């Protein structure tokens, strides 16, 4: 282990650069990998939007939703089916790809086809999983647990950097506030930036989730996604994480949180305007 390494202040996935003082980048896509056709449809649409707006975009989706509320809930296609789809999106569409991993042995295999490995919020303190992800050399995006203080992410990031990987992102996705409720404390964004030294991402869609709020599945209040996204970008962040879907109300998971694809471009355009204003008046590394 290398105990002297510090997290990079900016990281590059494909042609997308993340840095707290750099122009805003986006991580976007559907919650769950539903099929090859669906993934390519959404990825192609997102690439067109990103090209029109001139913003860096990483495509995200999950091959396995391993922490669903109910055992009967759809979980995804699985890693074996997902790998060639991830590779096709990355290699033929030219979009960097992010997916989450839940077990140590998934890390090396997923890293063959994606640019960013994501550690789910519930697993953010699992040392062996963090080390396995770090060992791949890929960028590691760690979701801050709903139970964790923002300053505690310094210890999480140090596990990755001590393994010799400086390419880390940290993501705020809300904090538990009573039962089935999350709130967003915007102070967490500059605190995490200062504590970790890593680029900070704001997850605007999971922050409006109501965990387990529908009994056998999670609810959500997607109407507040633009509100929280604007607030976070006004504070100043490296990127926003926004799940989007052509028909969220019929999505197999997290539909109540996801932004309809038809509304995505207008939202990102607004966020870019907020970002330009926030970073124009900010000093370098202010967040």
Curated annotation (Swiss-Prot):
Reaction(s) catalysed by this chain's protein: D-arabinose 5-phosphate + phosphoenolpyruvate + H2O = 3-deoxy-alpha-D-manno-2-octulosonate-8-phosphate + phosphate
Any single GO CC term annotated in Swiss-Prot or TrEMBL for this entry: cytoplasm
InterPro entries, per database record: Aldolase_TIM, DAHP1/KDSA, KDO8P_synthase
Predominant place of localization: cytoplasm
A single BP term in Gene Ontology: keto-3-deoxy-D-manno-octulosonic acid biosynthetic process
Compartment list: Cytoplasm
Key word Cytoplasm present: yes
Pathway where this protein functions: Carbohydrate biosynthesis; 3-deoxy-D-manno-octulosonate biosynthesis; 3-deoxy-D-manno-octulosonate from D-ribulose 5-phosphate: step 2/3; Bacterial outer membrane biogenesis; lipopolysaccharide biosynthesis
EC number(s) per entry: 2.5.1.55
Name of a matching Pfam family: DAHP_synth_1
Keyword Cytoplasm: yes
The entry's keywords: Cytoplasm, Lipopolysaccharide biosynthesis, Transferase
GO molecular function: 3-deoxy-8-phosphooctulonate synthase activity
Family: Belongs to the KdsA family.
UniProt protein name: 2-dehydro-3-deoxyphosphooctonate aldolase
Annotated organism of origin: Rhodopseudomonas palustris (strain TIE-1)
């Amino acid at each position: 282990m290398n105990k002297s390494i510090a997290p990079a202040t900016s990281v590059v996935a494909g042609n997308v650069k993340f840095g707290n003082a750099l122009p805003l980048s986006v991580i976007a896509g559907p919650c769950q990998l539903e099929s090859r056709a669906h993934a390519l449809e959404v990825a192609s649409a997102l690439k067109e939007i990103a090209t029109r707006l001139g913003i860096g975009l990483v495509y995200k989706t999950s091959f396995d939703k391993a922490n669903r509320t109910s055992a009967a809930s759809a979980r995804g296609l699985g890693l074996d089916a997902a790998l060639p789809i991830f590779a096709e999106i990355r290699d033929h569409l030219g979009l960097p790809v992010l997916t989450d991993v839940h077990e140590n042995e998934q890390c090396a295999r997923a890293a063959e086809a994606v640019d960013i490995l994501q550690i789910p919020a519930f697993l953010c303190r699992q040392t062996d999983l963090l080390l396995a992800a770090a060992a791949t050399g890929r960028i590691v995006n760690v979701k801050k647990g709903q139970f964790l203080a923002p300053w505690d992410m310094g210890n999480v990031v140090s596990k990755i950097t001590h393994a010799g990987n400086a390419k880390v992102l940290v993501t705020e996705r809300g904090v538990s506030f009573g039962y089935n409720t999350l709130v967003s404390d915007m102070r967490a964004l500059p605190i995490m930036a200062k504590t970790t030294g890593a680029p900070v991402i704001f997850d605007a869609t999971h922050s409006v989730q109501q965990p387990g709020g529908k009994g056998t599945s999670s609810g959500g209040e997607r109407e507040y996604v633009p509100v929280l996204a604007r607030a976070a970008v006004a504070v100043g962040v490296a990127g926003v994480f926004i799940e989007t879907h052509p028909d969220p109300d019929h999505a197999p998971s997290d539909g109540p949180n996801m932004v309809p694809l038809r509304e995505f471009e207008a939202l990102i355009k607004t966020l870019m305007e907020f970002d330009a204003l926030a970073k124009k008046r900010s000093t370098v590394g202010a967040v």
